[in-house]
């Protein structure tokens, strides 16, 4: 896979072109980044800066259907972002504070959003209720000053590794692992899905992946599966 990936600076925060997240032995590339904020009395107030990283094999997997699509087409496609969220590759999301936040504030808001959506679609079960309880417990005693980060590593097998960083460094090991596929996927979808909390991150991911998919070398077999005839990624700082 021929990738030219650069870092992004946004909201005063810097996201490097590649990271090795907690809970994974792989190095991921920066798919995109954006801020989360809202209009308050006529001013756009930024709360967090969010970076979305993907495992290298995301590009050939997505190229089968989406290569050649414009950034605008990808930005507006619900199906494209569902494929990112549910695809057979790892994802890593870094949520860095611009304004201070408590763990309780963060976990309760995420939990409320997830449960409301699950109940709407009739997919909220005892397993999800227990996963939400654990999710809230992990954050209970945490505080996040500006520059601190919440880290989510999402495995396609359904595990969600949660980590924290107060010094800008990415730890090798997470603070907790929750085994619930629905929660794992919902955390990312709540950010880049439609409607997600960061339209800016969604647009950034679509724009960068549109270019990476154009550059990608991939072979599609007759069964529609990808044969990776790819080159090593070229990651530019």
Curated annotation (Swiss-Prot):
InterPro entries: CFI, Chalcone_isomerase, Chalcone_isomerase_3-sand, Chalcone_isomerase_bundle_sf, Chalcone_isomerase_sf
SUPFAM superfamilies linked to this entry: Chalcone isomerase
Annotated catalysed reactions: a chalcone = a flavanone
Site (Important for catalytic activity): 106
Enzyme class: isomerase
Coiled-coil region(s): none
Pfam families per record: Chalcone
Disulfide bonds: none
Residues engaged in binding substrate: 48, 113, 190
Superkingdom as given in the UniProt entry: Eukaryota
Family: Belongs to the chalcone isomerase family.
Function per UniProt: Catalyzes the intramolecular cyclization of bicyclic chalcones into tricyclic (S)-flavanones. Responsible for the isomerization of 4,2',4',6'-tetrahydroxychalcone (also termed chalcone) into naringenin.
Protein name: Chalcone--flavanone isomerase 1
Species per Swiss-Prot/TrEMBL record: Fragaria ananassa (Strawberry)
């Amino acid at each position: 896979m021929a990738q030219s990936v650069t870092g992004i600076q946004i909201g005063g925060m810097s996201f490097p072109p590649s990271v090795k997240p907690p809970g994974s032995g792989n190095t991921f590339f920066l798919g995109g980044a954006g801020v989360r904020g809202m209009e308050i009395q006529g001013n756009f107030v930024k709360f967090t800066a969010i970076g979305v990283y993907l495992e290298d094999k995301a590009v050939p997997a997505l190229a089968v259907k989406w290569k050649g699509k414009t950034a605008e087409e990808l930005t507006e496609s619900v199906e494209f972002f569902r494929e990112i969220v549910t695809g057979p590759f790892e994802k890593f999301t870094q949520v860095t504070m611009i304004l201070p936040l408590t763990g309780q504030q963060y976990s309760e808001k995420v939990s409320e959003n997830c449960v409301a959506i699950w109940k709407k679609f009739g997919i909220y079960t005892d397993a999800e209720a227990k996963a939400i309880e654990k999710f809230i417990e992990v954050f209970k005693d945490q505080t996040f000053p500006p520059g601190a980060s919440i880290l989510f590593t999402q495995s396609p097998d359904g595990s969600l590794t949660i980590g924290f960083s107060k010094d800008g460094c990415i730890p090798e090991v997470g603070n907790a692992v929750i085994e619930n596929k629905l929660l794992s996927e919902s955390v990312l979808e709540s950010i880049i899905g439609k409607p997600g909390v960061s339209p800016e991150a969604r647009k950034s991911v679509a724009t960068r992946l549109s270019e990476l998919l154009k550059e990608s070398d991939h072979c599609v077999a007759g069964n529609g599966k990808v044969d990776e005839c790819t080159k090593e990624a070229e990651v530019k700082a």
